[in-house]
Amino acid sequence: PLYSASYQPIWAAAEACDMPLNHHSGGATPNFGSHFPASLAMFMLEVSWWSQRALWHLMFSGVFERHPDLQWVNTESGTAWVPDTLEKLDSFYERMKYSKYG
């Protein structure tokens, strides 16, 4: 997972070199095969989830706090999910900031 400490040297090097890291979503989606009529629709719906998941790993593990100049780019995942995700993150923050997890 991207929150693994084994990625720390990559985050540090990219930040030091002022080099954006690109995440292209969709590579981890299982192959549903062409025999299933909804295969393409299932793939298209899951593409943005994989981008979100990568971003969540970095956000919640503190990567962006440890590397404030790290540049992260999500490509080919659309942006329709961004407003709803930001709203959810704000809600989670409000609920968790005074808990033992905050």
Located regions from the model:
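Catalytic pocket-lining loop regions of alpha/beta-barrel enzymes
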Residues: P1-G102
